[in-house]
Swiss-Prot record:
Organism phylogeny: Eukaryota, Viridiplantae, Streptophyta, Embryophyta, Tracheophyta
Matching InterPro entries: Osmotin/thaumatin-like_sf (IPR037176)
Source organism of the structure: Glebionis coronaria
Induction entry: By phytoplasma infection.
Protein name: Thaumatin-like protein 1
Recorded family membership: Belongs to the thaumatin family.
Amino acid sequence: AVFTVRNNXPYSIAPGVLTGGGAAASTTGFQLAPGXSXNVNVP
C-alpha cells in the first residue's frame, strides 16, 4: 500500500511511520516542508 502524507501547515513537520508486526516501512521518518507531500510505501 502507498500512503501520501501532505503538509497543509504553514511550518515544517516531521511525520513518523510505524507498522505493527511484520516488515518495516521503507521510510520511518522524514521532514516535510509547508505545502509538500511524500509517498510512503508500507507492506
